[in-house]
C-alpha cells in the first residue's frame, strides 16, 4: 500500500540501526525505512498501569538520561537518531522540558542536523540509491 499511495518513507520497523530502501516482492522501491528502537520512543517511559503488577510512571529525567546516552553513542558512530514521539505523551510540561534538554545537548555537538522525516529522506535518498545500485553490480 505504501508503494501504491506514493509514500516516500516509513518508520514502522525496529529491524536495523540505519536507514535503508525497502523492497516489495524482491523488487526495489523508493520507500526509505527510518527504523527506530523502543528506547527512542516516549511511550515506554510514560505509559503506565494503575493495576499491579504493572509499569509505574517514569520521571522525565529517566527519558532525558536514556536519550542523551543513545545520542552520544550514535553521534560517536556518525549515525542517525530516530525518535518516536506522541503529542499526548511528550507534550506534557515536564516531559517537553526533557525533549528540550535533549535538543540542547545534541546542538552542543558539531554537524548535528535536526530535521523532519521528509527532509531526512530527501537528503539521504541519493546515497542510499547509489549504494543499492553498486551492490547489484
Spans of features found by a protein language model:
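Active-site-adjacent pocket scaffolds in enzyme catalytic domains
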Residues: 1-77, 133
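C-terminal domain-boundary segment and adjacent tail
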Residues: 9, 57, 61-137
Amino acid at each position: 500500500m505504501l508503494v501504491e499511495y506514493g509514500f516516500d518513507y516509513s518508520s514502522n520497523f525496529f529491524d536495523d540501526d540505519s536507514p535503508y530502501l525497502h523492497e516489495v516482492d524482491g523488487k526495489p522501491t523508493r520507500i526509505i525505512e527510518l527504523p527506530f528502537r523502543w528506547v527512542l520512543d516516549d511511550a515506554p517511559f510514560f505509559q503506565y498501569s494503575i493495576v499491579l503488577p504493572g509499569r509505574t510512571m517514569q520521571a522525565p529525567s529517566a527519558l532525558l538520561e536514556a536519550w542523551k546516552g543513545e545520542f552520544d553513542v550514535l553521534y560517536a558512530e556518525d549515525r542517525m537518531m530516530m525518535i518516536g514521539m506522541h503529542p499526548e505523551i511528550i507534550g506534557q510540561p515536564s516531559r517537553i522540558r526533557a525533549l528540550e534538554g535533549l535538543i540542547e545537548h545534541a546542538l552542543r555537538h558539531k554537524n548535528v542536523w535536526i530535521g523532519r522525516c521528509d527532509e531526512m529522506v530527501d537528503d539521504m535518498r541519493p546515497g542510499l540509491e547509489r549504494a543499492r545500485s553498486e551492490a547489484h553490480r
